[in-house]
Regions:
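Hydrophobic, well-structured mid-protein blocks that either form specific transmembrane helices
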Residues: 86-132
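Short glycine/proline- and aromatic-enriched beta-strand/turn motifs that initiate or cap beta-hairpins
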Residues: 30-78, 194, 220-222
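Flexible, solvent-exposed loop segments that connect beta-strands
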Residues: 49-65, 95-114, 142-168, 197-204
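Residues that define the transmembrane beta-barrel architecture of outer-membrane proteins
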Residues: 34-38, 67-71, 112-116, 168-174, ...
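Predominantly the C-terminal beta-signal and adjacent terminal strand-loop region
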Residues: 90, 96, 159-222
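Bacterial Sec-dependent N-terminal signal peptides
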Residues: 1-37, 41, 215-221
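Outer-membrane beta-barrel channels and translocator barrels
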Residues: 31-33, 82-84, 127, 183-185, ...
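Residues on the lipid-exposed face of transmembrane beta-strands in outer-membrane beta-barrel proteins
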Residues: 40-44, 71-79, 91-93, 118-126, ...
Length: 222
C-alpha cells in the first residue's frame, strides 16, 4: 500500500487554496457595498389563476383552478448598495398556467403559458445572509396553449386543444419573498401576485398566482 505524506510545500499550497476559497465565500456572504453578483438559477413554479366569478351553466358549481407544477430558470444580477440593501434584476423563463379541477362540464383541463419575466426587486438584508425582497415583475407571454375535455350535456366528452387562447400577452406581478445565501448558493422563495387582468373575456377577471422556489449559484463580478 502506497501512502503519500504531504510535505511542507504541499501543506502550504493546500492551506492557501482553503484560505482563498473561504475568503471568496466570505466576500459573497458579507454583502459588501458596491459589489455585483451574477446568479444563474433554476427552480419550480406552482402556478394557478384566479376566477372567482365563473360558474358552470349559471348554476352553483364553481370552476376551480388548482396549482400546476412547472419549470422556471434564468439569471439574476444584483448590485449591493450597502450591507443591508441590494437591487436585483432578473431574466426568467417561467412556465405558468393552471390545472382545472374536474367537474360536470370539464375534465383533464390545463393551460400553459410560457412567460419571459423581468423581475426588478429590492432586497433588504434584515439578518445575516437573509433578505426580504419586493418589487415589480413585467412578464410577456411567448406561447399560450389550453386543452380540456368538455361535456356536451349528454354525457359525451370531446377533447379540445387550442393555441388561440383568451390570455393576454402582458402580465404585471408583485413579487414578495425571501432569499437566503448559503456560501455561494442562494435559495429563493417568493409569491408572485398578479396585478392585471390577463384575459380578454369581458365577463370575468383572471389573475396569475405563482409560488416560485429556486436555487442559484452566485458569481462575484468585481
Amino acid at each position: 500500500m502506497i501512502v503519500i505524506k504531504p510535505n511542507k510545500e504541499m501543506k502550504k499550497i493546500l492551506l492557501t487554496l482553503i484560505t482563498l476559497t473561504l475568503t471568496a465565500v466570505s466576500c459573497l456572504a458579507q454583502n459588501e457595498a458596491g459589489t455585483w453578483t451574477l446568479t444563474p438559477k433554476v427552480g419550480l413554479n406552482f402556478a394557478r389563476m384566479t376566477n372567482p366569478d365563473i360558474y358552470i351553466d349559471m348554476g352553483d358549481e364553481k370552476i376551480e383552478y388548482t396549482y400546476k407544477p412547472a419549470l422556471t430558470a434564468g439569471v439574476e444580477t444584483e448590485y449591493q448598495l450597502n450591507s443591508h440593501i441590494g437591487l436585483a434584476a432578473e431574466l426568467l423563463y417561467s412556465n405558468q398556467g393552471y390545472t382545472l379541477k374536474d367537474n360536470s362540464a370539464f375534465r383533464n383541463g390545463k393551460a400553459t403559458v410560457h412567460y419571459l419575466n423581468l423581475p426588478l426587486t429590492a432586497k433588504f438584508y434584515f439578518a445575516p445572509n437573509l433578505a426580504f425582497r419586493v418589487g415589480l415583475q413585467p412578464g410577456f407571454a411567448l406561447g399560450r396553449h389550453i386543452e380540456e375535455d368538455e361535456n356536451d350535456g349528454n354525457g359525451q366528452w370531446t377533447h379540445h386543444s387550442s393555441s388561440d387562447t383568451w390570455f393576454r400577452r402582458f402580465d404585471l406581478s408583485l413579487p414578495l419573498g425571501l432569499s437566503y445565501n448559503i456560501g455561494a448558493f442562494e435559495v429563493d422563495a417568493r409569491y408572485n401576485l398578479g396585478l392585471n387582468n390577463i384575459t380578454d373575456v369581458d365577463v370575468v377577471k383572471i389573475h396569475n398566482r405563482v409560488l416560485q422556489i429556486t436555487i442559484g449559484y452566485r458569481f462575484a463580478m468585481n
